[in-house]
C-alpha cells in the first residue's frame, strides 16, 4: 500500500517536526505500507484564512496528482482540513483528514469533546468544520492558545519554546 501524506509545512522550514512526524507515522504503519511525505512551500506559518485557502488549493492539486500516480490513499495532515471536500471530489483515491478523523475519534470516547487550537484566528474555521461535520451538539467548546503556526513548529527544535507551549497548554 502506498499513502500520500500531505503536510501543510515542509522539511526545510520545520526539520524537527518533520523528522518526528516521519518517525511516528512510519513506526505505526503496517508492514508493506509506504508513506510518501509532501510539504507545502511556502508553508502555513501564519494563522489566516487566505493562507489556509492557498495551502488548501495546493493540497487539492496534490490529491489529484496522488491518484494519478498510483497512490492508494491520501492523508491530509492538517487539522483545519483546508480543501478536504474539494480534494475528495476531485481525487480518484480515498482522502482522509486529520481534523475530521480526530473529531470523530474523540467522539468515540466522550459524549462531548472540545478543541484547543493554537491561535484565536483559527476558531471561526474550526466552528465551520464542526458544523460541516455535523458535530455541533458534540463539540461544545473551542479554545485558543496564543501562538502562530511557525512558533509551534520551532518548538520542536527549541526546548525553551517547547516549555512555553506546554505552559500555555496547561
Task: Report each predicted region and the residues it spans.
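Short, acidic/small-residue loops that bind anionic groups at enzyme active sites
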Residues: 88-109
